[in-house]
UniProtKB/Swiss-Prot annotation:
It is an enzyme of class 1 (oxidoreductase). Ca(2+) 2 binds at residues 212, 257, 260, 263, 265. Monomer. Its main location: secreted. The proportions of glycoforms I and II are 35% and 65% respectively. (indol-3-yl)acetate binds at residue 111. This is Cationic peroxidase SPC4. Residues 1-31 form the signal peptide. Disulfide bonds join 50-131, 83-88, 138-333, 218-245. The keyword Transmembrane does not apply. It is found in: Secreted.
Length: 362
């Protein structure tokens, strides 16, 4: 299999997808089903305090993804990894402290894109300037940026409930490991994790469709290649993967969606039907009787996938949210507020870009 597209080619794909997605996104936003709203959230939360909040986030994401098509998957994954551990409270953004390492240092989060963290801080800073102070929470920025990343990649738009507040603490390393199952997990293990946060089999299949964009590292699926190919893996596809990953421990990446790696569409499910899912956690959705019918349904109908993804991601985005007087509105997304401090310097470490979406199912 060939490596990920060049930056120029990827940018061209992103631009085409952006143009094609506008009418579809508008229609989906106006007619999509909505799960019940968590108490304290609303669709017009910033109507008075920061009326341009959503347009500011949208504009930033559109421009940023045009320059780096891989950022869309990075922002979407960041929202997922935040919500699955301790709820949607932006705790994944917090740097470690004297009390211990932050969530970013846990194995499933080691390959979250540094550029995605930087983008959230950039957006938050822009909102601070445009809205006359720290008004919009980091957790709401995460939710909005994830939605706009889906849209700019050609996926459905959906209304994002707003009003989340930010946690003043991060989860333990063990809680991160418990909340983010590995890509080697099969459906029973995945459902066991999701059932603890009020997500079901339909949510699992729909949210896994986020793998229609992004990259996976060889080490995250090498168990399907060595010592012998997984029998659920298409033989031709297995051969392509072996050329990309010729030995265990190979430090290379490949698209999660072999057909349309930069477009948010239903081809991920077509891949599964053709036994071309990259991870065990992907392919087992088709192998397992409990989830197979949903994979078939989404492979046949992109509309059905988009409708369910929009519903499930909004449902996910309300897991254990902090509202009202709970938590805080951070002045710096990377650090809890200090008493009497209005703005803190950013502290997200700049490290080598990992560009890997693979050390966790989501």
């Amino acid at each position: 299999m060939s490596r990920a597209p060049t930056l120029a080619a990827a940018a061209a794909v992103a631009a085409v997808v952006l143009i094609c997605s506008s009418s579809t996104a508008t229609a989906a936003d106006g007619n999509a089903r909505q799960p019940p709203l968590a108490p304290g959230l609303s669709f017009d939360f910033y109507k008075r305090s920061c009326p341009k909040a959503e347009s500011i986030v949208r504009s930033f994401v559109q421009d940023a993804v045009r320059r780096d098509v891989g950022l869309a998957a990075g922002l979407l994954r960041l929202h997922f990894h935040d919500c699955f551990v301790q709820g949607c409270d932006a705790s994944v953004l917090l740097d470690g402290s004297a009390t211990g390492p932050g969530e970013q240092q846990a194995p499933p989060n080691l390959t979250l894109r540094p550029t995605a963290f930087k983008a959230i801080n950039d957006i938050h800073d822009r909102l601070h300037k445009e809205c006359g102070g720290t008004v919009v929470s980091c957790s709401d920025v995460l939710a909005l940026a994830a939605r706009d990343s889906v849209v700019v990649s050609g996926g459905p738009s959906y209304k994002v409930p707003l009003g989340r507040r930010d946690s003043a603490s991060f989860a333990t390393q063990q809680d991160v490991l418990s909340g983010l199952p590995p890509p080697t997990a099969a459906v029973p293990a995945l459902l066991a994790v999701l059932s603890k946060i009020n997500l079901d089999a339909t949510d699992l299949v729909a949210l896994s469709g986020g793998h229609t964009i992004g990259l996976g590292h060889c080490t995250s699926f090498e168990d399907r290649l060595f010592p012998r190919p997984d029998p659920t893996l298409n033989a031709t596809f297995a051969g392509q993967l072996r050329r990309t990953c010729p030995a265990k421990g190979t430090d290379r990446r490949t698209p999660l969606d072999v057909r349309t790696p930069n477009a948010f569409d239903n081809k991920y499910y077509v891949n599964l039907v053709n036994r071309e899912g990259l991870f065990t956690s992907d392919q087992d959705l088709f192998s397992n009787a409990r989830t197979r019918a949903l994979v078939d349904k989404f492979a046949r109908s992109q509309r059905d996938f988009f409708d369910q993804f929009a519903f499930s991601v909004v449902k996910m985005g309300q897991i254990k949210v902090l509202t009202g007087t709970q938590g805080q509105i951070r002045t710096n997304c990377s650090a809890r507020n200090a008493a009497g401090t209005t703005m803190l310097p950013w502290s997200v470490s700049v490290v080598e870009e990992a560009a890997d979406e693979s050390l966790g199912v989501f």
